[in-house]
Amino acid sequence: MPLIVLKDIRKSYTMGDGKIEILHGINLSIDKGEFVALMGPSGSGKSTMMNILGCLDKPTAGTYILDGEDTGNLTDSQLARIRNRKIGFVFQSFNLLPKTSALENVELPLIYAGIPNPERRLRAMEALKLVGLHDRMYHEPTQLSGGQQQRVAIARGIVNRAPILMAD
């Protein structure tokens, strides 16, 4: 069974009196373990598609089935739960909390998932070690280079061991 199935996904926005259709009937199936890249010129709908795939936005029409569950009728809190358990995110701007250590930044998704502190701390430390930052885990983002901040964001994206990792 595919991990992600999109059927006739459409997304449009109303701007003034007009309607702008960004996504036009997208069909897609992604199996667990598959690596997929969305490519296209600026303004082609990549970010819109990523927001839908990441359950950050809903399509205007069509069906999105994530791990066997139709996301179309889910509430915002149900979508948040799915994001926390099934999707790891690495944002282009990293979205690190400025006055928080690398370790605490990586722990955030685990806090939302209700993972108790001893396990949470250990998993965050393991994720930072995987990205080569075990020696910088107590540094705040301003004390890290851009590349190190990016690796903190990657560690935060993988710490929940979600089946999907989305990177922008």
Task: Identify the role of each PLM range.
Residues 2-167:
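ABC family nucleotide-binding domain
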